[in-house]
Amino acid sequence: MECFVGIDLGSTTTKAVVMDDKGQVLGRGITNSRSNYDTAARVSKLEAFIDARLSLIRRELDKEPAVAGRVDEIIDGLTRNFRREQFIEQLGDLEQTCVANVEGPRFAGKEKAIVGALTEVFRRLREEEADKLFAPDAQRKSDFFRDLAGSRFMQIGEEVARANGVEFDHLLHMYDKSIIEVENRPPSADMNRKFRSAMERVRGEMSSALDTAALGAPIDAALEIDMSERYVVGTGYGRVRLPFPKEHIRSEILCHGLGAHLMYPKTRTVLDIGGQDTKGIQIDDKGIVVNFQMNDRCAAGTGRYLGYVADEMNMGLHELGPLAMKSTKSIRINSTCTVFAGAELRDRLALGDKREDILAGLHRAIMLRAMSIISRSGGITDQFTFTGGVAKNEAAVKELRQLVKENYGEVQINIDPDSIYTGALGASEFARRAVVEA
């Protein structure tokens, strides 16, 4: 099976989409962009091919009468247990790297104790935490290895350090130094072994409720399908750093416009708010860009701004929207500048304003800035599509809907659950057209 890949290298996350020769999306992958763009591109592409393999497995399972009505449950189990296999593999890599980094005069005479403490920390992570993180009902705030391993390493590391008379700072130093090395080494691409191990765990989880023998043939058939990468197109904030020839690079404006058109063919106006920029794009009925505007010079009012606000308030980025939705009044925020955001935020808190009201004001300020950019690009024409990571923020969406109605009346607003992949989707379609329509 020939596959066409689009990679969108953003300032905070890198996304990839795998498409077949008919234009059908097979898989999507995402990772944090890191300092090494080459690695981010490889990891996101690997993640997209993993997701594509799961799509093929789903197709084969849909043909099997014995698992009718249970396919979603089986795919969920395979996905969870595949991620568990990946997590354990990367834990092993992280442990070896941490142990190898226990050297130098700072640790002289303490090496054995530090290595012993590290060994115990990683034993507990493997034997106690892996099953909890990937249990059927587990709620994970992130799927990135750094986040999953880091939070548990800190807690267990403190306990082990106290019990073994080792300075916790030494363990923390090992982790901080080693996680960068591990992140810049993509996980092994040995998908088949991991899927087969995951399948055995799914059989154990579902053995009392399902003829698990029926799982083997469909999954084996899907794993045997050869998926070959025919053409790749890269786009995004860091596209000039992608390891591709010039002819394999496309503007992020073109890719977002085409991607939005593929999601919603009647789209005429696109707003994309990403980690580093805000784009207002006008497209025609074929997805061709006819006009656009972007934020100038700085990252004010973008995802990076929200990330800075989250850090200032000691919250997770995903918590900002839900808290802002609890607001009873919106406070006027004078600046969406990242540099001054902290100062104004602290001033508002000192005046006694509630955090949720401040956040509501911040979200409105962001969307007012976005509306200004859209206006300069030509305004909003029905239909209107909102894309990018900020499109997952419910408070931002609420403010956008209100502002659109106030300024343009009743307009259909499209927000796809996978809107963060819009640029990568457009890039994958450019890759497909480069071959199929050549």
Swiss-Prot record:
SUPFAM superfamilies, sorted: Actin-like ATPase domain
Its EC number(s): 1.3.7.8, 1.3.99.n1
Positions with a binding annotation for [4Fe-4S] cluster: 298, 337
Pfam families reported in the protein's UniProt record: BcrAD_BadFG (PF01869)
Residues spanning the membrane: none
Domain of life: Bacteria
Gene3D superfamilies assigned to the protein according to its UniProt record, in alphabetical order: 3.30.420.40
Annotated keywords: 4Fe-4S, Aromatic hydrocarbons catabolism, ATP-binding, Iron, Iron-sulfur, Metal-binding, Nucleotide-binding, Oxidoreductase
An example Gene Ontology molecular-function term: benzoyl-CoA reductase activity
Cofactors required: [4Fe-4S] cluster
InterPro entries for this protein: ATPase_BadF, ATPase_NBD, Benzoyl_CoA_Rdtase_A, CoA_E_activase_dom, Dehydratase_Activator_Redct
Cofactor note: The iron-sulfur cluster may be a [4Fe-4S] cluster.
Name of the top EC class for this enzyme: oxidoreductase
Oligomer and partners: Heterotetramer composed of A, B, C, and D subunits.
Name of the protein: Benzoyl-CoA reductase subunit A
Organism: Thauera aromatica
